[in-house]
Amino acid sequence: MRVSLEVDFAGVRFKNPFMLSSAPPTGSGEMIERAFEEGWGGAIVKTLAYDIRQTQNVQPRIHSVHQDGRIIGFSNIELGSPKPIEVWLKDMGRIKKRYPGHVLFASLLHTEGLVESQWVDTARRCEEAGVDGLELNFSCSHGMAESGGGASIASNVDLIKKVLGWVKGAVRIPVMVKLPAMVENLPYKAMAAKESGADAISAINTLNSLSGVDIYRFIPHPQVDDKSAYSGLSGPAIKPVGLRCVAQIASSADIPISGIGGIVNWEDAVEYMLVGASTVQICSAVMQYGYRIIKDLETGLRHYMEKMGFERVRDFVGLALPHIKKHNELSREYRLLSQVNEERCIGCGLCSAACGDSGYQAIKMSEKRRPLIDEEKCDGCGLCTQICPVLNCLTMKRRI
Amino acid sequence: MIKTGVAIASDEELQWVLAEASRCLFCVDAPCIGGCPVHIDIPQFIRLIRWKDFKGAKETIKIANFMGSICGYLCPAGELCQKDCVLSKTGSPISIAALQRFACDRADYGSEIKTAAGTKKRVAVVGGGPAGLSCALELRGFGHEVDLFEKEKFLAGTVAQEIPEFKIPQHILKKEIGELDLNQIRIHLGIEVDRNLLEREISKQYDAIFLGVGLSRSKPTDLNRKNLKNVFDASQFLNSIKNGAINQLKGICITIGGGDTAVDCARMALRLGAQRSILAYRRSQKEMPAAKAEVRQALEEGVEILWQVTPFRLAGQKKVEAIEFARTKLVSSAQSGRKRFKEVAGAKLKLPVNVVVFALGKDRDDGLGHFLGDRTKTIDLKTLQVGKTKYFVGGDFFNGGETVVEAIADGQRAARSIDHYIRSG
């Protein structure tokens, strides 16, 4: 079967659905060109600053959240691009000439206060430079959001409509709105964006966070001359939040969605697509491993589609949505029971501790260190199957 | 290639240690604890390492084993705690001994005996090795007055005298002994308790006596009738290396034996400069009692092993110059599961040699060995009490030569029995 990774997204043709999000991996024209050489389908330039005196960065500005030595998230206090718009316009023009088959969006706008002329002017100049579309950053959770931009725009429907109206009135290229996760009534905000002419929505951005605290010096991270600020959390830790947001937007507004948040591998990307995203954007995984991850993203997605019989990405976009219901619509007749595969069990006993101390005291260990499940007591919560360290050892079966 | 065998304790290793600790599943009633003769709460100390509370980890280890550091170096962990790690079933077990070494090396910790109300009962502990020290510390904790008699001028017994530096660095041993709360025990160094002293004085003055004097008599060989030079027994050999009397070897060194001590001698010979170090064992690799990991390391370092040979003659003028072996074959034994060996008629092997070490094991020395004599049969294997007497035994003196950790376990067990004996008597 012939599988195509090509995607038509808000009228723009992508050779594959993988984009670099507006972030450190798209920090310069040279970097984006290398990313396109590696095979990325698209890139969104790091959010442009109207006045680069406002994007003077601090050092350090990136911290990570670890578990057992592995990164589960980054939290950053980096601002918009410190490169002048003039430089970017030249770079964007060159990139589009050299890589016409790759999609380039500009991201607007790092500035203080909402000034119509700044948005209109920047949007027009980007369009003239030849970009395929614009992404409006209504979602940056730190820095910008503290000075009236970024996520503070998305917190107010009137502001969304106003800024979107300015930009839509100025350009003909597609305009995508990037919405944050931590905002009141996200579906309502998405609908407002669509009604005001947005051609697509991307979600989510980083979550406003405090990365961690140095417990011996009492200073949170990242530490800038012994002081810190609230930071934007990204990476695998936020993926479930991103999935929820994309699903909510897809269920309420009929609009192309670019899914963002903790995508590391092709399976993550497929999950976002199944809840309604037709392209995905990636930053943190590139920050950790570099552009070369596009190889495994692409081949993994291709093989998944072959296995599932999907010719195009659109064949499976949103297929998970009908399975999301209101909690009170879920069946109460569906009853489960934990069961153990004794051949797989290694006898660690974690299930008995979990069930005993966080469940229903239904699991005791036998003399031979195998779980004995009390069918009367098991309440079907499923905790044991989740904490069991062995694949396919504890599973839930239907009660007859 | 000879490895130093020195433990993990540097910052470079910290990352490995944390990653290894994070693999531990924190099993409920963890099987590894059952595999440890002194039942260290292994998952607990590993979890404390994982959360970087190294002092907490060390406390957890030391509460169960006052020689936790030394045992981290010496325990054949692959045959004890690690053998029972459930992760063996899906991959490789946790390197428990390495983590234990790390915690003990890395953290500062000084023990303090929490003494129960004084009983005014007096116990004599004979022998200041792992078993005796362990028994003495426990007994003091139970509130008894303890006198410990050690024939050498230092504590730790075999660990200090014979186990080579490459297995247990001197500074680690010193640090561990230094961390003990010995002030509450009366320690008498340089006092050799012979049968006379034991029966005439000590037995009259004390309510109970623990004998943990180890084994001091090397099993004899009758091959060196001409008293050739450069023929040693293992204790002599290892002890002379430790005290500096032997600091260099030349030529070919052949060690006879198949236990851990024999392997130590063979590995030590290479370290002292022997061109070849050959270990000669009368049975096959399968029957060899030495810890498998030790044998593997010896082979990696370049020790050669001759299986199924038994020496029958030493030749030379003044110094030993050659050794002759007969080949053996193994025959099943009806009585014990272990195979017996027989010489194969006519199958001989003659090798030039410069140093011969006989590591045939050790026995109880004549004095206290004879004191125990037939009473050995009356030792209660659970309580370690000799008959119904006030005597208790443990360690190598009792078990014929096992690991340090088993000696410590014996000392603890005997201390509990002695406490019970004293309080109920």
Indicate residue ranges for each PLM-predicted region.
Chain A
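Short pre-active-site segment immediately N-terminal to redox-active cysteine/selenocysteine motifs
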Residues: 344, 354, 376-377, 387
